[in-house]
Amino acid sequence: MRCSDLLLLFLLALCVLPGISCRNQEEKLLQDLMTNYNRHLRPALRGDQVIDVTLKLTLTNLISLNEREETLTTNVWIEMQWSDYRLRWDPDKYDDIQQLRVPSAMVWLPDIVLENNIDGTFEITLYTNVLVYPDGSIYWLPPAIYRSSCSIHVTYFPFDWQNCTMVFQSQTYSANEINLLLTVEEGQTIEWIFIDPEAFTENGEWAIKHRPARKIINSGRFTPDDIQYQQVIFYLIIQRKPLFYIINIIVPCVLISSMAVLVYFLPAKAGGQKCTVSINVLLAQTVFLFLIAQKVPETSQAVPLIGKYLTFLMVVTVVIVVNAVIVLNVSLRTPNTHSMSQRVRQVWLHLLPRYLGMHMPEEAPGPPQATRRRSSLGLMVKADEYMLWKARTELLFEKQKERDGLMKTVLEKIGRGLESNCAQDFCQSLEEASPEIRACVEACNHIANATREQNDFSSENEEWILVGRVIDRVCFFIMASLFVCGTIGIFLMAHFNQAPALPFPGDPKTYLPP
């Protein structure tokens, strides 16, 4: 048993000792590399040596673009590579160790920062370990969530596209000390933002059209005599997906605004109801305009396309309210206040209705006749007016109850003459009834004249109402045409506002992987 235990311990030692030896070699290698190593000094053999630093940006998520704050939020991986001659070793001396993981705080870093950040976070979010290789090359892949500034052009909102940039530069070193380069893989320069299909999460509001990358030296702020200034700029040209705004703002706004045009189908005299509907539509449009104002930046450089459309609809609605007031004013005119000229009658009652497809009532030929039947109550009212106009002495009757029954008295007197079967009695009865007959004739003439005047008054009233209807129909065609043409014209402007086919005008390169 003792021999077997010793054999087992020997075998375990053979399995464990290589791992211990390897781990000790990594520790020894790290200790040897960090001896007399100063992370604050640039890894250059000579003072004029320029250190090459390659960059590659991998986009994992386009989180959001806040138009109001003009902020682009992205989740990226920044791949950086450079060479440090102080971190070289011979793998044969350290059990063939081919790479070493070292905390990034222990080695020299090129201090690459995002220049156009908006929240003051210039540096990397998480300082991960760097990979060091025997030839002294260093590979660093830290993750970061950046909030960069992005100038928003709201002219065609919500059918717009934006060109956002992420500008990287060294915070400490100029182009005379380090050389920022784009990564080269398989002999090809990666002149674009790399997107890993497996790790990338597509944004629901924005579609990426172009993602080129460029290096810029000595931008307009510096002259060649100054210390060389270099940047690596990654561009994100993105197109908005407008479906959300079409469904939730544009379509409801168009439907509500079309109700303002439908008020022309109300009667011409219903001006109050027309104004009520139009003002309610105007209030709804104001609410939509307020919602848009909460979304876009507070800028006076341009007016959003949807803001222009809502303003256009508000102007149309206000014009409809003005039209309703004018039509109501015309429809309620009377001969006592306005007289219609022949030119107005010819244009608005004969000429325009033919072109507008309106059926106007035809005038009856011959002498004017009463077009409506009058009730007996109306005749009695006219008789009362006549009695008030005549002197009291001429309206004395035998009985007060017969004051409103002139014909009854006349017929009773004539009837007594007929009952006597005597011509002399009949003539005498006619002579007795003659004052009442004259009064009846005068009353009938007064009623006929008053009825004729009332018919003429009503006829001219109806003519003004017809003029109001014609004005209403003309305004309907104008406003409907303006509404349709304006809607189509404004949104056709959005249709032609597409992201460019190439990222840079005049440059035929697509800056995309082959």
Curated annotation (Swiss-Prot):
SUPFAM superfamilies: Neurotransmitter-gated ion-channel transmembrane pore, Nicotinic receptor ligand binding domain-like
Residue ranges, Cytoplasmic side: 331-473
Disulfide bonds: 150-164
Modified residues (Phosphotyrosine): 386
Compartments in which it is found: Postsynaptic cell membrane; Cell membrane
Gene Ontology cellular component list: acetylcholine-gated channel complex; neuron projection; plasma membrane; postsynaptic membrane; synapse
InterPro entries tied to this protein: Neur_chan_lig-bd, Neur_chan_lig-bd_sf, Neur_channel, Neuro-gated_channel_TM_sf, Neuro_actylchol_rec, Neurotrans-gated_channel_TM, Neurotransmitter_ion_chnl_CS, Nicotinic_acetylcholine_rcpt
Ranges that cross the membrane: 242-266, 275-293, 309-330, 474-494
Function comment: After binding acetylcholine, the AChR responds by an extensive change in conformation that affects all subunits and leads to opening of an ion-conducting channel across the plasma membrane.
Protein name: Acetylcholine receptor subunit gamma
Biological classification of the source: Eukaryota, Metazoa, Chordata, Craniata, Vertebrata
